[in-house]
């Protein structure tokens, strides 16, 4: 009996020791601090795990005993065998990487994948930079990358421009769920600010129309956001708290997130509050027209134009915002995981600054022009299963519901009638994604997607003197927009030096619209509309890696965008004295893209990446003069306005160059620079051409970073080239309020460069301090196409604690 107990004890001890030995501990080399979020994968397997806040992870989920790969942004990727891991007693150290351009794992195929295997250009943003860079919104987070140009009509906004495209020609993905709706606009789009920058875990920008796994309408690219998630390894209560102040914004920001787990359950909560005052512009150089010398005030029932005591204060830009997020994870078994996520964002009323500064005969036009609260809510239920079957090795199912609400409130000076138009969108989506490894280093990912949008739109006027309410025309027809898609991506290793990747997407879109509510206001040509659009898009690329430090990647791809409700059915004053009307004959547009990506690393000192691309947009949807019932002008909101409609032009084309360089000057000193040049043109009615509106001027960033121990400081420059009058897009020439004038009195957008200094210091293991000076020279500048003048010299300070 004693012998049996002895054997039993030894067996239990060995099993326990084996289980214990499967737990890896990852630390940073210099200070031996634990590293959280390290991704651990096994070669020839798509399964991955992440280290906890204590730098630990359980390796028992890996059945394959191939080499382990440990990767974390900002650190050198480590590959080691299981024998080497055992020899290190399961304690591993990662060395800081001198380079930041590399992204070890990306989600171009909707699954984690090595960036070296992807032929297209992808940029991952380092979350560790969030604390240092002080992005006011997620739009600023993207703009700080040096890869995305951001237009702002108001402080509570930010419309990204990528490779000459913007708005509904770009696609947003939140935790794998499509954010784009049927009313995403063709002009400038502000929805990206609904996402809390402090709740973002990973950000990736997939450039060009080759991102068929996310949507055929991603003409310019896809912005992929992964938000913070619960950590099953964390069984304790922990979190972060942050407060931030900035002078030019009169900002007060507060953020809290915390997580905890118990057994198979884990939870994460996040909340942020942002409050901004009227933005202060710079005082040096600039233009007299940039100053806010007057503003409107309602006094004793009369609109009064008042002198601004501080013309650099952009009266009518203040707003606030709240973001909430809750996630719950249940590890049902070793191979099955269930996740629930809730997101909510709302703003206060957001004054549209570019409209508030419009003048007619030297007098301000609008007494009020606000976006009502921009609300976004998403609920998602995701099921993930890992189990080797003939059809898949991994499977993900996502069910999501999103609610969007937006409104516009406007009133002209001296007119008691206030117009309010409000829209709601209910968006339902299903995604099923499968991953199958084929013959070791080849894999196939495929899936299906179904999306349904229900659009409701209403219009109302209020007489502010007697509060009388009356109906008026709505912005959109009552509509239903559907999308069904099947997509696949195949990645193969053709040789040790060459990899191939190809993808296909079959998409069917349908649109139904009912214009009945607006027929009493405008003689529209139809009372209802119904159409379907079928598309087949794809991409094919090769990664040729002749040397470990050099790769050449050609890629061809196509895109397709069918008209949505905003394109086809909108009634809106798109510019002063103009009105955009529905066009039921509007057809889809087709994109054809070719690009070449080159990566070169010279020793451990220099790293360069260059991308050249060309995109042809056939049957491009552009604004052109039109008529309604034979009339070239109609009365809209009480003003005689010239009629325009979106129509299919013969073509539009974009060509460009993207370049980046990193230079290690010292083990603690790194220089980085990114530069983007793009030119676009579109055909006009008379067969002449005009520069494309969303092809931003050349822009970029350069940065010198010093990082040592618990201290980092960055000196960086951000710059943009001039858009002279003869290169101004025709559409922009109708917006004199937002552009400077040259010596001949013609509109143009001046070049600019600003310098900023930022730093962060780890005061203790639990307290960090960050701060800096933005726009040190206090330059007065307005980025191309923006109504908002950018902030002047801005002092910002952030205090962060963790527990």
Question: How should these model regions be labeled?
Answer:
Residues 179-207:
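Short acidic/polar hinge/loop motifs at secondary-structure boundaries
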Residues 89-93, 136-141, 158-161, 173, ...:
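N-terminal periplasmic accessory domains that precede
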Residues 495-496, 508-509, 613-616, 634-729, ...:
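Gram-negative outer-membrane beta-barrel transporters
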